[in-house]
Amino acid sequence: MKVGIIGAMEEEVNLLRNELTERVDTEIANYHFYEGYLGNMQVVILKSGIGKVNAAIGTTLLIDKFKPDVVINTGSAGGFKKGMKVGDVVVSTEVRHHDVDVTAFGYEYGQVPGMPPAYEADAKLVSVCKDVIENLPDVNVHQGLIVTGDSFINDSKRVADILGHFDGVAAVEMEAAPIAQTCYQFGVPFVVTRSISDSADEEANLSFDEFLETASINSAKMVMAVTKRLEQA
């Protein structure tokens, strides 16, 4: 098995990249790929850059050029669920766009024409992630809907707008839906796991800057534990 791992930012991939053995670096169209092994698991890590277009292009290159069997999207997110704390980890049950509106033509809010309203994460990967995280010390795990848009959400009015369109939102971020959509189109199983860096409120930018490192460390721990579990499966 080969696992594709996607993080948007340097902080979200550097810990994993530094753990690779037999590492090979490749650059394609300004996207950076890092092949190697985490333990005995063959992986390829993509630093995609921030935002939906970057994520979609990078994921397409990852799948087309490196042929991963599964894809894990990791990194940070803004938390929506009550009781969620910075450093907690969210595992996606499904992923949707929160900034797509073609409802005038009969589509659901968030649905891209010709695509499903939601992209369901692979049930086996969700189960593995949940089980692994529950056994990590000092990390709380949540499951739920992750929504994606090309904006950093730090406004309670925008939070209310998102919650008005979707039930059960666990977290918001900027890359998961196009990654999920690309995996759907290529038929590659995926899961999104995000560590909470902020609460998507008016203090979100300050919280994000302060807690990105914590969120990134927790995400890296989780991904390494998941690849180890998949290696044993």
Swiss-Prot record:
One CC-aspect GO term: cytosol
Active-site residues, Swiss-Prot/TrEMBL: E12, D198
Similarity remark: Belongs to the PNP/UDP phosphorylase family. MtnN subfamily.
EC number: 3.2.2.9
Taxonomic source organism: Exiguobacterium sp. (strain ATCC BAA-1283 / AT1b)
Pfam families referenced in this protein's UniProt entry, alphabetically: PNP_UDP_1
Gene name, Swiss-Prot/TrEMBL: mtnN
Domain of life according to the entry: Bacteria
Protein name: 5'-methylthioadenosine/S-adenosylhomocysteine nucleosidase
Alphabetical list of InterPro entries matching this protein: MTA_SAH_Nsdase (IPR010049), Nucleoside_phosphorylase_d (IPR000845), Nucleoside_phosphorylase_sf (IPR035994)
Function description: Catalyzes the irreversible cleavage of the glycosidic bond in both 5'-methylthioadenosine (MTA) and S-adenosylhomocysteine (SAH/AdoHcy) to adenine and the corresponding thioribose, 5'-methylthioribose and S-ribosylhomocysteine, respectively. Also cleaves 5'-deoxyadenosine, a toxic by-product of radical S-adenosylmethionine (SAM) enzymes, into 5-deoxyribose and adenine.
Reactions it catalyzes: S-adenosyl-L-homocysteine + H2O = S-(5-deoxy-D-ribos-5-yl)-L-homocysteine + adenine; S-methyl-5'-thioadenosine + H2O = 5-(methylsulfanyl)-D-ribose + adenine; 5'-deoxyadenosine + H2O = 5-deoxy-D-ribose + adenine
Keywords linked to the UniProt accession: Amino-acid biosynthesis, Hydrolase, Methionine biosynthesis
Lineage: Bacteria, Bacillati, Bacillota, Bacilli, Bacillales
Known pathway: Amino-acid biosynthesis; L-methionine biosynthesis via salvage pathway; S-methyl-5-thio-alpha-D-ribose 1-phosphate from S-methyl-5'-thioadenosine (hydrolase route): step 1/2
GO biological process: L-methionine salvage from methylthioadenosine; L-methionine salvage from S-adenosylmethionine; nucleoside catabolic process
